[in-house]
Amino acid sequence: MLTKRIIPCLDVDNGRVVKGLNFESIKDAGDPVELAAKYSKDGADELVFLDITASQEKRKTIKELVSNVAKVIDIPFTVGGGVNSMDDARNILLSGADKVGVNTGAVKNPELLTELMTIFGKQCVVVAIDAKRNYSEDSTKTMFEENGKKFWFEVFIYGGKQETGLDAIQWAKKATELGAGEVLLTSIDKDGTKDGYDILLTKKIVDTVSVPVIASGGCGKPEDMSEIFVKSDVDAALAASIFHYENQSVNQVKKILRDKNISVRL
C-alpha cells in the first residue's frame, strides 16, 4: 500500500506567506524560508510554494525566494505561479524546485503541458486546478447534484479571479493526457473554511485521471485528512491553515493519521 503524502502549502504574496478564505481576505502567516525549514524538519513529505499573485500581476515567480527555500529543505518541492512558458518553468527548476505547478498558463496554452513533459519529464509537471461550483445546468458539463441543487465544477484562473467556462473534470482528464504527471486540485468553495476537503470533487477527479492527485482546500484538522484519504483514495493532502495557525506539527498530524490506519511515512 502506497503511503499517503502530507504536504504543507506556502501561499506567497509579496515575499510573505499568507492565507485567505475562498481565495479572498488574505492575512499574513509568516516568513516562507522559516516555515519551509520548519515543515521539512517536522516530517512533511513535500512542500508546495504558490506565488499567488504572480499570474494576476503578470510577473514571474520570485526566483530568489524559491532558491532560498530550496536551500533549507530536503524534501521534494513544487513551485507554481506565473508559469506561462518553457523559460518560466526552466527558471523555477534551476532555482531549486523539483516540480513546476501550472494553472493559468496551461488553460491559456494547453500544449505547454506537452512541451514541459517532453523537456523535463512528466514527473516534473503538475497541473494546478482551482475549481468552484457553478449552479447553471449545462448538458455538455459533468453535472452533480447535492441537496437538490444541480451544478458542475468550473475551472478558475488568475488566482481564482477569472472563470473559464471549463469543466474541471474534463480539464483534468485533458491536462493529464497532454502531459501533466500530477494534479494539484483546489476547491475554491472549501478554501480556508477549515470544514473539510471537497470529497465530491476530489473523488471524481481521482476516479477520472490515472496520475497522482493532491487534495487542497478546506483542511482544518487531522480528521479532515483521514476522511479525504478514506473517501476519495486521493494520493496526498495539502494544507496550510492547520500548520500555519493551529499549532499542529506535521508529525503530530501523521501520528493521528497512523492511529486511524492511514499509511504515512513517519
Swiss-Prot record:
Gene3D superfamilies linked: Aldolase class I
Pathway(s) per entry: Amino-acid biosynthesis; L-histidine biosynthesis; L-histidine from 5-phospho-alpha-D-ribose 1-diphosphate: step 5/9
Please name the source species: Nitrosopumilus maritimus (strain SCM1)
Q: Quote the subcellular location field of this record.
A: Cytoplasm
What broad class describes the main subcellular location of this protein?
cytoplasm
Entry's family note: Belongs to the HisA/HisF family.
Pfam families, A to Z: His_biosynth (PF00977)
At the top level, the lineage of the source is: Archaea
Q: Does the keyword Lyase apply?
A: yes
Reaction(s) catalysed by this chain, per the record, are: 5-[(5-phospho-1-deoxy-D-ribulos-1-ylimino)methylamino]-1-(5-phospho-beta-D-ribosyl)imidazole-4-carboxamide + L-glutamine = D-erythro-1-(imidazol-4-yl)glycerol 3-phosphate + 5-amino-1-(5-phospho-beta-D-ribosyl)imidazole-4-carboxamide + L-glutamate + H(+)
Instruction: Write one Gene Ontology MF term.
Output: imidazoleglycerol-phosphate synthase activity
This entry's Enzyme Commission designation comes to: 4.3.2.10
Which residues carry out catalysis? D11, D130
How this chain assembles, per its entry, is: Heterodimer of HisH and HisF.
Which class of enzymes does this protein belong to? lyase
Q: Which NCBIfam families match?
A: hisF
Per its record, how is this protein called by name? Imidazole glycerol phosphate synthase subunit HisF
Q: Does the keyword Cytoplasm apply?
A: yes
Q: Name one GO biological process term.
A: L-histidine biosynthetic process
